[in-house]
Amino acid sequence: MTRIPEIKFYTSPVYEGKWWDFRLTKPPKINEEQFLQSVNKIRARKQLFQEYLRDITRILGIEWSRKEIEVWMVSLSIGVFSRPLTLSLCWERGKVRDIDHLIDDLTHELIHNALIEHPRYSEALKLLEKDYAPEPFRTYVHILVHAVHVLIYKTKRGEHRMEWDIQKAQSNQPYARAWEIVQKEGPEKILEKYLGSKN
C-alpha cells in the first residue's frame, strides 16, 4: 500500500511577521479570535484532507518521497501557494474566508505538491509548452492541477464547487485558460497523455 504523507498544520507569529515586515503595503488581516476559529475548523478536517491526498496519490500513481506536508496558516491576506504550503485565512478585504473556499484552495495546493513528486512532471511541462505555446507557464502548470482537481470535485466535493472555482479563475487569465483546456480535452485524457496516468 502506498504511503501517504501526514498533513500537519502550523501557525507561526515569526513566519507571519516576516510577511508583514517585508510588505510595503500592509495586507489586510483578521483578528486573533477569527484566526483561531478558522485554524480550528481546518484542523478539525485533517482526515478529510488526508482522504483527498490519498485520492490525489491514486489518480497520479505516485510514490511520495516525503513523510509529511506542512501547511502554514496565516491571518494576513497574502494568497495561497504551494512551497512552503501557505494558506491565508483572510480575504483581500479583511474578511474571514469561508471554510469551503479554504478546503478547495488547500486541495489545489496539495495537488501542486503531489505533481512535483511525479517522475514525468518536468517532461510533461515541456510537452505542454510545445502543445500550447505561447500560453504562459502558469497555464501549463494549471492544466495538470485542474485536471486532477476535476476528479476530486466530481467524486468528493460536487460540481457546484467546481463551478465556483472556475468562476473565481476568470479574473486570472492563465488559470481561466487552463480551465478552458481541461474542459475541452477532458481531465482523463490530459492526465494519460502527459503523465501516463489512467483513471
Language-model segments: residues:
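Compact alpha-helical subdomains of small soluble proteins
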Residues: 79-84, 91-93, 99, 161-199
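Acidic/histidine-rich, surface-exposed loop or edge segments in extracytoplasmic proteins
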Residues: 5, 11-41
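Active-site recognition of the HExxH zinc-binding catalytic motif
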Residues: 100-119
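Soluble non-cytosolic domains of exported or imported proteins
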Residues: 43-50, 97-101, 105, 135-139
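Sec/Tat-exported extracytoplasmic proteins
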Residues: 56-60, 114, 118, 149-156, ...
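Post-HExxH zinc-binding segment in Zn-dependent metallohydrolases
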Residues: 125-174, 178
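Auxiliary, metal-adjacent structural segments of Zn-dependent hydrolase domains
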Residues: 27-84, 156-157
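Ser/Thr/Asn(+Pro)-rich, low-complexity disordered segments
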Residues: 78-80, 110, 125
